[in-house]
Amino acid sequence: MNKDCIFAAPIEKLGDFTFDENVAEVFPDMIQRSVPGYSNIITAIGMFAERFVTANSLVYDLGCSRGAATLSARRHITQPNVKIIGVDNSLPMVERCRQHINAYQSDIPVEILCDDIRNIKIENASMVILNFTLQFVPQQDRQLLLEKIYQGLNPNGGLVLSEKFRFENKKMDDLLIDLHHQFKRANGYSELEVSQKRTALENVMRTDSIETHKERLKSAGFSQIELWFQCFNFGSMVAIK
């Protein structure tokens, strides 16, 4: 696994964070050291797939990056005639994802598309995964995307939505942000790396509160919604049609 050193040296003109070649190369290391509970979420996505995925249906991994969630789901699918569709708008991610998927043998076909997830038609879905993806979608487009997902899910189909959260209570928000930064420092990131990455993400990652996510999901049509995992200001929700 290649080590993430992207923000280790001072960057004079710090642009917006992008999922480019450099990020794609070190992404597994970056996300493990940056997102508390990431491995638990990936493992649980497979467990959810065991429960949600039905025969003759599709599974969508929207914002699939290098395929960790796709592979976790595929390992746990036992139903016949299931196909997984992974989508990411970063070509370097898609190329590595295809290599990663092809390195493992399985009877379950996987198609990885390089596209904007907002362009994808969701249909005959028994499960949809949004694993730390919605926070990078423009806020004005999030409701419509969730509505498309709800419409494309079969009855009893499930959506797993993992996100970084913000909290309305400023004192609590500041505390959880500080604890997250402490988590990153404990994983070997310097103060410079933490601050430069935070600045680079400011304009591209817009976080919402848990309440906002629940309201959006309700408005999309979901009635069964639960936060099933949280560690500091990161967590994952499940919604069932």
UniProtKB/Swiss-Prot annotation:
Q: Name one Pfam family in it.
A: Methyltransf_25
Quaternary arrangement and interactors, per the entry?
Homodimer.
Q: What is this protein called?
A: Carboxy-S-adenosyl-L-methionine synthase
Name the GO terms of the biological process aspect: tRNA wobble uridine modification
The reply to whether Transferase figures as a keyword in the UniProt entry is: yes
What organism does the record attribute this protein to?
Answer: Histophilus somni (strain 2336) (Haemophilus somnus)
**A molecular function GO annotation:** carboxyl- or carbamoyltransferase activity
Q: Write out the entry's keywords from A to Z.
A: S-adenosyl-L-methionine, Transferase
Enumerate the catalysed reactions: prephenate + S-adenosyl-L-methionine = carboxy-S-adenosyl-L-methionine + 3-phenylpyruvate + H2O
Q: Quick one: which residues bind S-adenosyl-L-methionine?
A: Y38, G63, C64, S65, D88, N89, D116, I117, N131, R198
* Primary role: Catalyzes the conversion of S-adenosyl-L-methionine (SAM) to carboxy-S-adenosyl-L-methionine (Cx-SAM).
Task: Give the protein family.
Answer: Belongs to the class I-like SAM-binding methyltransferase superfamily. Cx-SAM synthase family.
UniProt EC number: 2.1.3.-
